[in-house]
């Protein structure tokens, strides 16, 4: 039996940092593979917050719920601006 005066240590392993771009890529692929229109489904999720817009295929629903919807929108806006507006 351990002595009651000793302190036990509990170490929590750091979760790998989630990259929003990678989440979007995986979700897009999963939705496409299941035959859904990925744009409609992702927009539905962003607008409503309802995760049932996203398939469970490839763990996409769980992944997308790990990032904030505003972070997804921000990533999409950065991509659009960088690739369409800054070139003009």
From Swiss-Prot:
It comes from the Bacteria. It holds the Pfam family IreB. It comes from Lachnoclostridium phytofermentans (strain ATCC 700394 / DSM 18823 / ISDg) (Clostridium phytofermentans). Belongs to the UPF0297 family. This is UPF0297 protein Cphy_2298.
